[in-house]
């Protein structure tokens, strides 16, 4: 008796695979010719909570409109209509991540040693004075007389 002979049993592999509802590109449905980079409210729907552009498989946009959408978002970010990062990152600043190595390794203890201040020794050096003979300008400009 083969599998085809058993009408009450499901096909091999059990239940059928889950097939999600096919997503339709909202720009194609609305017949949008150009995606406006100035419409930040519409563009914000295609940005994740971390400030990244959502992929096609999540938003359902077609390849053509996904490229145009990415360019519009980048243009809006460049002229400061949209943020590059999400709001919680802007509010908190650069938050250090947890590092288990840093937490497990104790900080080195500095031995409290008596540190004596450095003593500066200044040696006096005698510099001989050199006297140069300076001629007045009037005498220096006269040519030497030949005898």
Swiss-Prot record:
One of its GO terms (cellular component) is cytosolic small ribosomal subunit. InterPro entries: Ribosomal_bS18, Ribosomal_bS18_CS, Ribosomal_bS18_sf. GO terms for biological process: translation. The keyword Repressor does not apply. Keywords: Ribonucleoprotein, Ribosomal protein, RNA-binding, rRNA-binding. Gene3D superfamilies: Ribosomal protein S18. GO terms for molecular function: small ribosomal subunit rRNA binding; structural constituent of ribosome. It comes from the Bacteria. PANTHER family: 30S RIBOSOMAL PROTEIN S18, SMALL RIBOSOMAL SUBUNIT PROTEIN BS18M. Belongs to the bacterial ribosomal protein bS18 family. Binds as a heterodimer with protein bS6 to the central domain of the 16S rRNA, where it helps stabilize the platform of the 30S subunit. Part of the 30S ribosomal subunit. Forms a tight heterodimer with protein bS6. This is Small ribosomal subunit protein bS18. It comes from Dehalococcoides mccartyi (strain ATCC BAA-2100 / JCM 16839 / KCTC 5957 / BAV1). The lineage of its organism: Bacteria, Bacillati, Chloroflexota, Dehalococcoidia, Dehalococcoidales.
């Amino acid at each position: 008796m083969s599998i085809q002979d058993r009408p009450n049993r499901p096909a091999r592999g059990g239940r059928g695979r889950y097939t999600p509802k096919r997503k339709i590109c909202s720009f194609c449905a609305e017949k949008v010719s150009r995606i406006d980079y100035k419409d930040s409210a519409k563009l914000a729907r295609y940005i994740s909570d971390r400030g990244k552009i959502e992929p096609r498989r999540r938003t359902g946009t077609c390849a053509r409109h996904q490229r145009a959408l990415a360019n519009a978002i980048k243009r809006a970010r460049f002229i400061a209509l949209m943020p590059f990062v999400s709001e919680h990152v802007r509010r908190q600043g650069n938050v250090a991540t947890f590092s288990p190595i840093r937490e497990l390794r104790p900080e080195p203890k500095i031995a409290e040693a008596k540190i004596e201040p450095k003593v500066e020794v200044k040696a006096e050096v005698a510099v001989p004075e050199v006297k140069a003979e300076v001629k007045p300008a009037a005498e220096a400009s006269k040519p030497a007389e030949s005898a």
